[in-house]
Amino acid sequence: MKQRQFFGTDGIRGKVGAGKMTPELALKLGWAAGRVLSRTGTKKVIIGKDTRISGYLFESALEAGLSAAGLNVLLVGPMPTPAVAYLTRTFRAEAGIVISASHNPYYDNGIKFFSTDGSKLDDAIELEIEAELEKPLTCVESHLLGKAKRIDDAAGRYIEYCKGNFPADQTLEGLKIVVDCAHGATYHIAPSVFSELGAEVIAIGDKPNGTNINHEVGATSMGKICETVLAEGADLGIALDGDGDRIMMVNRKGEVIDGDQILYILAADAQKRGQLKGGVVGTLMSNLGLDLALQALDIPFLRSNVGDRYVMEMLKKNDWRIGGENSGHILDLDHGTTGDGIVAGILVLAAMRRQNATLEQLVEPMKMLPQVLINVRFEGSNNPLDSDLVKSAQREVEQSLGARGRVLLRKSGTEPLIRVMVEGDDHDLVLAHANRIAAAVKLGC
């Protein structure tokens, strides 16, 4: 299959006003997507966004391009990525578009698509859109132009959907929960979901101003929520990222519960209820402790490439339901078609209620192995992983670790980063090895 030029592993993403993320490209992308999507279906597309200041200009540009191609546009405003997937399904739209750069800083933005069933757009359709981008932009005749309107009750619809994933015979009464919305797309949704289920909610990261998304809050910056859980004497904390498709949690001791541990909780709970279909899909970055804990329960475990797209592919291939990443993308195909931080949190809380257990008790059987991840930024077109210096450092570290650990080096699919991950049974040794390889990567840039 032909390689995609514009779409990456999670749509198009970059710094606003540079490279691909320009108003001109967004206009042309809307038109190109409209040309492809108008060939079949309802000729109706949903557009949602996170809280970045640049979301307004990309929303307008996409809307204009889609309308020029003859598609009607439903605007839902700031809305979590999984909410757009859900609304795309329920409105029977031809596609959903999300304007977001997820966990990236505010000066980045991105555009990604969902198909009519709420899943990521197929590679083949993305290639068709890219082919249309090479053509000159034209406009349909005036009477065929698309219309645009705003959906005022989109947030309420999604709140009810989220609550519907919690057992009807249970409540969250008696629980004090800190909810960190990362100043992102869940700011007007997540606190309502958990409070309406009965919890006492302390919201942080719920005051977006266009430039503070993910800044020292959210699932990629856990210091604030850990402090707040301890200061408030809360039972737990739930941290979401800027577009709401990731979750990290915090127990009452202020300790972080990551995506691997959440996967263990969900898989173990599903097995207890006889509802686990097959096994669990993690990624190359998943902690070895998850693998070992699932082995103890006789639950099969497979690793995909990094990225929720690849986790989804492996789940579908094996007809399994639960998978995800240690970064907090959690997929449960019985409860949605994409990673959903709010729903994943609800499923963990449901497990706590069913088993009358705390978050610490649910995760206690899983012992995390020391794992160090270092992100090394690079510039230029050369791949530092091709450097002989890096290859030599990796080889020597792997020989030192032997069967007691592993090394993973990978180039990020969304940022100019090399991710250096080292795992083993001795934290100090793992840290030293990771720093050694990271230094080699910097020299190899």
From Swiss-Prot:
InterPro entries: A-D-PHexomutase_a/b/a-I, A-D-PHexomutase_a/b/a-I/II/III, A-D-PHexomutase_a/b/a-II, A-D-PHexomutase_a/b/a-III, A-D-PHexomutase_C, A-D-PHexomutase_C_sf, A-D-PHexomutase_CS, Alpha-D-phosphohexomutase_SF. The gene is glmM. Catalyzes the conversion of glucosamine-6-phosphate to glucosamine-1-phosphate. One of its GO terms (molecular function) is phosphomannomutase activity. This is Phosphoglucosamine mutase. Pfam families: PGM_PMM_I, PGM_PMM_II, PGM_PMM_III, PGM_PMM_IV. Mg(2+) binds at S102, D241, D243, D245. Keywords: Isomerase, Magnesium, Metal-binding, Phosphoprotein. The lineage of its organism: Bacteria, Pseudomonadati, Pseudomonadota, Gammaproteobacteria, Alteromonadales.
